[in-house]
């Protein structure tokens, strides 16, 4: 049975030879060490972690592969537009907003692209057809909620 006397409830002193009290102090030290360990883990140097362990705010919200496909698509569009407008000033190259195109139907997308590329000196039809087929395969990036 447990004793209700206050003498048995006092904290152990490190100077006595009671083995029970030494075990108690050892577990107390372990408990203290683990609390300081967890505090130090919150202040880790992120640059020293392996890449796979580094926190990435962007990929928390979006899938890395999905973002990579969007990036590749945008780079492809930029390269194609530069090729179509080759020999003209860079300021005359139009901006194509893929997000805005995703909101439109396929026919409206084609109409919008033809309007954007109306000043294009090159043949724009193969580019428009390829872009429309790639847009069908591309999923929309969800907009962050406020």
From Swiss-Prot:
Protein name: Protein phosphatase 1 regulatory subunit 14D
PTM statement from Swiss-Prot or TrEMBL: Phosphorylated on several residues.
Region: Disordered, residue numbers: 1-57
Function summary: Inhibitor of PPP1CA. Has inhibitory activity only when phosphorylated, creating a molecular switch for regulating the phosphorylation status of PPP1CA substrates and smooth muscle contraction.
Domain of life: Eukaryota
Subcellular location, record wording: Cytoplasm
Tissue specificity field: Isoform 1 is detected in intestine, kidney, lung, spleen, stomach and brain. Isoform 2 is detected in testis.
Organism: Mus musculus (Mouse)
Keyword Ligase assigned: no
Disulfide bond sites: none
Gene this protein is translated from: Ppp1r14d
Key word Phosphoprotein present: yes
């Amino acid at each position: 049975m447990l004793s209700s006397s206050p003498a048995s409830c006092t904290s152990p002193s490190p100077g006595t030879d009671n083995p029970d009290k030494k075990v108690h102090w050892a577990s107390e030290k372990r408990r203290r060490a683990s609390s300081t360990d967890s505090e130090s883990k919150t202040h880790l140097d992120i640059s020293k972690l392996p890449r796979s362990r580094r926190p990435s705010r962007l990929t928390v919200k979006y899938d890395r592969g999905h973002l990579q496909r969007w990036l590749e698509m945008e780079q492809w569009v930029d390269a194609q537009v530069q090729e179509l407008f080759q020999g003209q000033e860079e300021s005359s190259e139009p901006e194509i907003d893929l997000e805005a195109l995703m909101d439109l139907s396929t026919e409206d997308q084609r109409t919008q692209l033809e309007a954007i590329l109306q000043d294009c000196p090159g043949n724009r039809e193969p580019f428009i057809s390829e872009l429309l087929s790639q847009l069908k395969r591309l999923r929309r990036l969800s907009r962050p909620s406020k």
